[in-house]
């Protein structure tokens, strides 16, 4: 009851308020809850509610400004700051969006997901039953030896007969005894000799063939629509032998056993269980390709792949190989354009006899580069050796309604279809069965309903991948940060004295400081932050790494994390398809994951900003009191640490108030633009970028950039808040600012505090009388202004309502993409679909 009420409430709230409003509600609600807990949680000293609200706001927005000394708080109050920070960081928030979208995807396809789980359980059960010894597999199927033979070739012994006998009828039992109209059921009580004697040719009726020196291909045919006959090619051998299973390679015997062991009653599940190593096509017939190591059902039905070591030099090989997946020799061009696909029932091809090709060598090199190729193939064989295949000659009679499960497993199901005006159709893996029309920023347009469903399937799997990867990333980096800090706290020289001097437990200091670094909070239990430890190179550098990985550098680190996992970990092919789609079109699935080019741009921009801060620090602060006592090498490390903290965390390893005024100005500028690199990338890669800006470009504006539009919009939002906040605070703190004896207050220090709050950084010139931020001496109204600036600054750069990565699955999203495409290109989407349909025909 309660769950249904919550679901109805979310269904009403999300479309009504939009993502940004919900984000505000979430942050403000947690701020109020945290402030109440902080206000009531003090045991030794009580703090004012305005200070509790100020600390709670700094924690939930990751600002890091403190109006009271954190070391004076109780452990419970410190833990509240720690916990509420963890559930409001950008990684948590954007990851939660992915989980919510995944939940709605599952609700939309709940029946299909239930079927998917059932089939997955059946596959696991079947796999456990198939764990037999190697000797048992060598015996064939149910103790029988399997013969590989060509049907109805006993009359084609001479070349003359071969020319005269170009076709045979597959439905006439008198002319074609090897394709009976009513084959017996495998479950029928028929003896082996009786079955093979009735339906299979005798050994004397077979055609001998020298496999060492000839090619034989049966695909130059023009089948009759009325009779469904077969046409044999003109270049064939004059002799052929029947091969017993004992004469074949052991792996071929197992594969042949699998092909010959057919259970039509279980065939409905076959299309799902062979999704990793099989290709399924409904509209085209089954086609077989034979090699010395494979018995392959070709592209338009099933394909079973073999280990590379099993292919001898100069022997038979599969015709095509893409990324370790063996394709069949049957191409779409082999079918006549005027022929309906359903009129052909079988095709047998012998390809690659003693014919080394450039493609073969290239494929061999590609397979050797893959460390887990052989292992993955063996696992695929072990999963699929005894899986059933229908006796039926095509799958046209088994057509079912399109379901999500078939969408998820049909990446190779259909032949590639052309696209119109595609800006980008290159795919890391062929996760779609058609060549999509991909417009700006991964906008898929001019697609049919079936193509949209298939795109939704791969997007659903990519979304599952995002959820698992972002969870792993968050957990791994938090654990790694804690381990490094705990090692420092218990092993570093001098660390014990510093931590113990403030009556802190080293384990709790390590946990709090590591989370504060990775979550970019900037709070430190040591009142002077990192100043007492500014000579420890390890702590400063490792903290800088976690600070970058948790905030501004997260898109770069996260894409590298996904790409490395995609390359090294031996996933199933279905999961690799999802990861490939995620890397190709990241902004359809996750707000903080950018395409490769945009990620590199972000990386170099961040590097440039850090280098600028580093150079200014080293040049302008050479003789300042803050760094004069530090050796040159330690000074460089402190410069790196401070340049990183300027735009994110707000930690300090030197006294900020003692730095050169020009350095303080540069820090203020860096705090102001801290969110710009990520925000501009996020909006520039938005699928609905033009819709969010209200500006639509045409084909003539192809080379123009939207950077100017983004900057103009961002500045128009930001500057008003900053100057309005500064104006109100100057009114409230006018007496302190005008007092010449009060050195802590000036127009510049107040502006520095305002920009730090709006940029959610947390740097402050501080107070000479206490270890707090300048805000500690503000009046209540000024503190409320700082809180408002923190909340507004936390939400700048977030995606608007029109962002594909935050929208729930809906047909309206597809209409938005196509409307934008139509406005930009100036033609009807219906005409675009029509051109695609014509090209398919």
From Swiss-Prot:
Glycans are attached at residues 116, 164, 215, 401, 771. It is a multi-pass membrane protein. It is found in: Cell membrane. It holds the Pfam family TrkH. Residues 173-192 are annotated as: Disordered. GO terms for cellular component: cell division site; cell tip; Golgi apparatus; medial membrane band; plasma membrane; plasma membrane of cell tip. One of its GO terms (biological process) is potassium ion import across plasma membrane. GO terms for molecular function: high-affinity potassium ion transmembrane transporter activity; potassium ion transmembrane transporter activity. Keywords: Cell membrane, Glycoprotein, Ion transport, Membrane, Potassium, Potassium transport, Transmembrane, Transmembrane helix, Transport. InterPro entries: Cat_transpt, K/Na_transp_Trk1/HKT1, Trk1_fungi, TrkH_K-transport. It comes from the Eukaryota. The chain crosses the membrane at residues 24-44, 80-100, 469-489, 507-527, 537-557, 600-620, 662-682, 715-735, 747-767. Belongs to the TrkH potassium transport family. Together with TRK2, defines the major, high-affinity potassium influx transport system. Involved in maintenance of the proper sodium/potassium ratio in the cell and in regulating the plasma membrane potential. This is Potassium transport protein 1. It comes from Schizosaccharomyces pombe (strain 972 / ATCC 24843) (Fission yeast). The gene is trk1.
């Amino acid at each position: 009851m309660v769950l249904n009420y919550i679901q109805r409430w979310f269904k009403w709230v999300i479309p009504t308020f939009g993502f940004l409003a919900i984000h505000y509600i979430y942050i403000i609600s947690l701020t109020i809850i945290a402030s109440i807990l902080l206000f009531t949680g003090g045991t030794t000293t009580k703090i004012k509610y305005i200070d509790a609200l100020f600390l709670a706001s700094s924690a939930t927005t990751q600002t890091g400004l403190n109006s009271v000394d954190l070391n004076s708080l109780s452990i419970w109050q410190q833990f509240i700051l720690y916990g509420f920070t963890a559930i409001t960081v950008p990684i948590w928030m954007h990851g939660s969006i992915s989980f919510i979208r995944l939940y709605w995807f599952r609700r939309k396809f709940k029946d299909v997901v239930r079927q998917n789980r059932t089939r997955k359980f059946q596959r696991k059960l079947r796999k456990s039953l198939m764990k037999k010894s190697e000797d048992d597999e060598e015996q064939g199927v149910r103790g029988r030896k399997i013969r590989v033979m060509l049907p109805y070739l006993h009359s084609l012994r001479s070349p003359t007969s071969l020319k005269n006998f170009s076709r045979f009828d597959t439905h006439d039992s008198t002319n074609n005894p090897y394709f009976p109209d009513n084959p017996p059921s495998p479950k029928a009580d028929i003896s082996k000799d009786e079955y093979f004697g009735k339906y299979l040719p005798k050994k004397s009726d077979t055609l001998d063939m020298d496999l060492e020196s000839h090619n034989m291909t049966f695909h130059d045919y023009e089948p009759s629509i009325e009779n469904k006959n077969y046409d044999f090619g003109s270049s064939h051998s004059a002799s052929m032998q029947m091969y017993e299973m004992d004469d074949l390679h052991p792996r071929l015997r197992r594969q042949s056993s699998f092909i010959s062991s057919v259970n039509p009653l279980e065939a409905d599940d076959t299309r799902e269980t062979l999704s990793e190593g099989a290709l399924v096509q409904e509209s085209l017939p089954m086609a077989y390709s034979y090699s010395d190591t494979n018995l392959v059902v070709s592209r338009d039905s099933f394909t079973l792949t073999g280990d590379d070591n099993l292919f001898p030099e100069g022997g038979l090989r599969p015709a095509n190989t893409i990324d370790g997946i063996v394709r069949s020799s049957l191409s779409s061009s082999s079918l006549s354009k005027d022929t309906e696909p359903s009129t052909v029932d079988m095709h047998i091809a012998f390809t690659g006899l003693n014919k080394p090709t450039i493609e073969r060598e290239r494929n061999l090199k590609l397979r050797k580069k893959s460390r887990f190729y052989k292992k993955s193939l063996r696992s695929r064989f072990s999963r699929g050796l005894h899986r059933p295949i229908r006796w039926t000659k095509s799958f046209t009679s088994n057509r079912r309604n399109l379901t999500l499960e078939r969408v998820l497993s049909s990446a190779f199901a259909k032949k590639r279809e052309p696209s119109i005006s595609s800006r980008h159709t290159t795919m890391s893996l062929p996760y779609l069965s058609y060549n999509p029309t991909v417009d700006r920023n991964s906008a898929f347009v001019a697609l049919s309903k079936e193509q949209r469903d298939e795109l939704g399937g791969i997007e659903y799997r990519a979304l599952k991948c995002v959820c698992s990867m972002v969870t792993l990333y968050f957990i791994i980096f938090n654990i790694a940060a804690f381990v490094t800090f705990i090692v420092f706290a218990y092993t570093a020289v001098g660390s014990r004295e510093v931590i113990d001097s403030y009556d802190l437990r080293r384990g709790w200091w390590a946990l709090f400081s590591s989370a504060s670094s990775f979550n970019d909070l900037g709070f430190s239990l040591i009142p002077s932050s990192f100043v007492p430890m500014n000579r420890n190179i390890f702590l400063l550098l490792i903290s800088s790494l976690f600070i970058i990985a948790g905030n501004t550098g997260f898109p770069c680190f996260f894409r590298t994390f996904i790409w490395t996992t995609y390359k090294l970990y031996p996933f199933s092919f279905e999961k690799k398809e999802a990861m490939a789609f995620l890397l190709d079109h990241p902004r359809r699935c996750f707000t903080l994951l950018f395409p490769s080019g945009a990620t590199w741009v972000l990386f170099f921009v961040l590097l440039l900003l850090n280098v600028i801060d580093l150079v200014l620090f080293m040049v302008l602060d050479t003789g300042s009191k803050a760094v004069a006592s530090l050796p040159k090498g330690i000074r460089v490390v402190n410069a790196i640490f401070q340049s990183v903290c300027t735009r994110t965390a707000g930690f300090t390893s030197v006294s900020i108030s003692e730095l050169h005024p020009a350095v303080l100005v540069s820090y203020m500028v860096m705090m102001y633009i801290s969110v710009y690199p990520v925000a501009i990338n996020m909006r520039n890669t938005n699928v609905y970028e033009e819709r969010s800006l209200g500006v639509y470009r045409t084909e003539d504006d192809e080379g123009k950039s939207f950077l100017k539009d983004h900057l103009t919009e961002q500045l128009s939002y930001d500057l008003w808040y900053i100057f309005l906040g500064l104006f109100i605070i100057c009114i409230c703190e006018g007496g302190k600012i005008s007092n010449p004896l009060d050195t802590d207050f000036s127009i510049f220090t107040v502006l520095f505090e305002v920009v730090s709050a709006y940029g959610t950084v947390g740097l402050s010139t501080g107070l000479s009388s206490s270890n707090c931020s300048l805000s500690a001496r503000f009046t209540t109204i000024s503190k409320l202004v700082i809180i408002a600036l923190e909340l507004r600054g936390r939400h700048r750069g977030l995606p608007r309502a029109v962002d594909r990565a935050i929208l729930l699955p809906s047909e309206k999203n597809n209409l938005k993409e196509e409307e934008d495409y139509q406005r930009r290109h100036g033609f009807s989407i219906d005409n675009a679909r029509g051109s695609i349909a014509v090209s398919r025909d």
